[in-house]
């Protein structure tokens, strides 16, 4: 499973429901992964003093790299959904990563990922 930036943000904010949901998913054997896009989005919006906690959380998760083929899929997502659904590059890259690896995406913002059929809405 890939977790979207919004799920990671809720964990960093100390949301107990989201944290418990993520812990339960991990304990049940789900591999929890993220896209480098999420790491960039979160670091960009973080205070310097928050970066240690952010780095620690990311180090506890597996990253799925962005490959050339991921870029192709993201371009296809943008071509198809940018105008009709206001899909942005970051979300297109996250969606493409999920598609390429056959992973579910955990997000609170399913509307940002119109091309994905395997979306999970975590507890909030």
Map each language-model feature to its residues:
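A short, glycine/small-residue-rich beta-strand->loop->alpha-helix junction that serves as a flexible
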Residues: 85
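Acidic, PIN/NYN-like endoribonuclease modules and their adjacent C-terminal/linker elements
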Residues: 95-124
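Alpha-helix capping/helix-boundary segments
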Residues: 7-8, 38, 70, 93-94, ...
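A general structural signal for well-ordered alpha-helical segments in protein cores
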Residues: 18-19, 39, 51-54, 71-74, ...
């Amino acid at each position: 499973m890939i977790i979207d930036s919004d799920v990671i943000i809720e964990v960093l904010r100390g949301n107990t429901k989201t944290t418990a949901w993520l812990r339960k998913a991990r304990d049940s054997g789900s591999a929890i992964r993220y896209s480098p896009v999420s790491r960039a989005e979160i670091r960009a919006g973080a205070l310097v003093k928050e970066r240690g906690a952010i780095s620690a959380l990311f180090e506890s998760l597996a990253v799925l790299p962005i490959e050339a083929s991921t870029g192709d899929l993201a371009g296809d997502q943008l071509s198809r959904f940018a105008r009709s659904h206001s899909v942005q590059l970051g979300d297109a890259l996250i969606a493409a990563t999920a598609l390429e690896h056959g992973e579910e995406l955990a997000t609170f913002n399913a509307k940002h990922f119109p091309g994905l059929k395997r979306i999970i809405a975590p507890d909030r």
